[in-house]
């Protein structure tokens, strides 16, 4: 089994951001009802006031403001499916697993089109809450552990935050250049490990508040 992060790895740039902009164009009221709040949350996150998991949850908030969400998701992927990296399509296998911090409702349609399995963040768009921890950093490795540690032949990601699950794979690859260049995973020297530790910090081990 090969495992892939999604955003920045086999899709560029970020499906939540891309779909959020798509929805704002289709439903212009979001420019006034959601985007000002989104920029406020971003400021709090950059200043270190809001932890990563809460920033992500707040960023998913627009999903509950779009009445025709499922229809818009299909139309979005009709147009954006072409952004899936060609290098991935050339090596795609039926037992691939996409593992992503993005919400399930966004990842599910494209995973179905690709014919592969997926696991993503469980988010209740009606109530605006996470139903489980954000599928990010250590949570990806925890998911693998909880499934009996299946063999991961190859793992691909664009982020050092995925180092915990990269260490679970027989071989890990680092994706850069707008999801176009694939290289070996960086050596985990002290400087790199310091970066890893800062990236995997979500603020708390429980993401449900």
Stretches with model-predicted labels:
Residues 51-86:
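Metal-dependent phosphoesterase signature
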Residues 24, 39-47, 63-67, 77-81, ...:
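Generic secondary-structure transition motif, activating predominantly at the C-termini of alpha-helices
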Residues 76-209:
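C-terminal cap/substrate-recognition subdomain and adjoining C-terminal extension
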Residues 1-48:
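Active-site neighborhood of HAD-like aspartate-dependent phosphohydrolases
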Residues 34-62, 111-114:
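Short, compositionally biased "basic patch" segments
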């Amino acid at each position: 089994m090969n495992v892939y992060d999604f955003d920045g790895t086999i899709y560029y740039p970020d499906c939540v951001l891309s779909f959020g902009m798509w929805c704002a164009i289709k439903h212009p009221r979001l420019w006034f009802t959601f985007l000002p709040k989104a920029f406020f949350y971003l400021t709090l996150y950059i200043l270190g006031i809001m932890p990563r998991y809460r920033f992500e949850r707040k960023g998913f908030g627009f999903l509950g403001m779009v009445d025709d969400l499922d229809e818009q998701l299909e139309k979005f992927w009709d147009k954006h499916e072409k952004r899936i990296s060609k290098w991935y399509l050339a090596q795609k296998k039926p037992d691939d697993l996409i593992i992503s911090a993005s919400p399930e409702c966004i990842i599910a349609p494209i995973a179905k089109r690709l014919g592969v399995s997926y696991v993503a963040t469980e988010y209740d768009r009606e109530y605006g809450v996470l139903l489980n921890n954000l599928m990010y950093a250590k949570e990806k490795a925890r998911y693998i552990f909880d499934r009996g540690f299946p063999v991961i032949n190859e793992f691909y990601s664009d982020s050092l935050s995925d180092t915990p699950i990269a260490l679970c794979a027989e071989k890990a690859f680092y994706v850069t250049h707008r999801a176009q260049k694939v290289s070996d995973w960086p050596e985990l020297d002290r400087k790199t490990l310091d970066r890893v530790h800062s990236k995997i910090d979500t603020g708390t081990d429980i993401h449900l508040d």
